[in-house]
């Protein structure tokens, strides 16, 4: 019998997985060995032949890895989506990002907006800036951008500590962070879909499928919603 399932997990799903893991472990009498990775690190793990039983990874990363022959999962499915969102330190002004006009006004009202440095292995900042450029907000956003070396959760933590006035990253890397007020998801015009794909590796033990079944259940879906993810049907 397998005593441990090795899991490769995207940073955007980290808060959910850390909440889900103890419940699954208690119910099934085994341990989840969790490895969290940015998209670039996920790719590097796959290129290096990293061994794992199951995972929740960014869908586009898995699709590219499959196309390149680096991943051959037994099966996979779209588990959840994390929209892009914005947050400010708790106690700050109640700003709005509900519409594109609101978002533009909020940017203009701030002096610094933290983004994850692409060197950290995530492409969120590039996607956000490209969308802002198309909408005429790029110059304003770039003038305020502060790039922090780390995934979105680290960037949000830095904002909570006062290193910048706001953060833009995945909602699931803002909502769970203590000391951050989640302003809401960015307007649809600014969105890029970050889908989380759950997968079972080829020749994985039956417990890996049990984890997939659990992730599809209502308890898991409720936890996902609580950290800013939108579960897929």
What positions do the PLM features span?
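Exported/periplasmic ABC-transporter solute-binding proteins
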Residues: 1-29, 35, 40, 44-53, ...
């Amino acid at each position: 019998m397998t005593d441990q399932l090795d899991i490769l997990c995207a940073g955007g799903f980290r808060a959910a997985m850390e909440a889900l893991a103890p419940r699954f472990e208690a119910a099934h009498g085994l341990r989840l060995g969790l490895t969290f990775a940015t998209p670039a690190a996920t790719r590097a793990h796959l290129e290096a032949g990293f061994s794992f039983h199951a995972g929740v990874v960014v869908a586009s990363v898995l699709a590219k890895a499959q196309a390149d022959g680096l991943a051959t999962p037994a099966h996979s499915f779209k588990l959840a989506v994390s929209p892009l969102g914005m947050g400010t330190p708790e106690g700050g002004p109640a700003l709005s990002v509900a519409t594109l006009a609101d978002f533009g006004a909020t940017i203009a009202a701030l002096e610094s907006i933290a983004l994850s440095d692409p060197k950290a292995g995530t492409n969120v900042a590039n996607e956000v800036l490209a969308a802002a450029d198309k909408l005429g907000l790029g110059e304003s956003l770039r003038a305020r951008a502060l790039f922090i070396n780390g995934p979105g959760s680290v960037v949000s933590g830095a904002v909570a500590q006062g290193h910048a006035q706001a953060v833009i990253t995945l909602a699931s890397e803002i909502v769970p962070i203590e000391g951050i007020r989640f302003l809401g998801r960015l307007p649809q015009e600014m969105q890029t879909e970050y889908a989380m794909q759950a997968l079972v590796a080829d020749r994985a033990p039956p417990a890996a499928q049990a984890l997939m079944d659990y992730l599809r259940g209502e308890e898991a879906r409720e936890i996902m919603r609580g950290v800013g993810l939108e579960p897929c049907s």
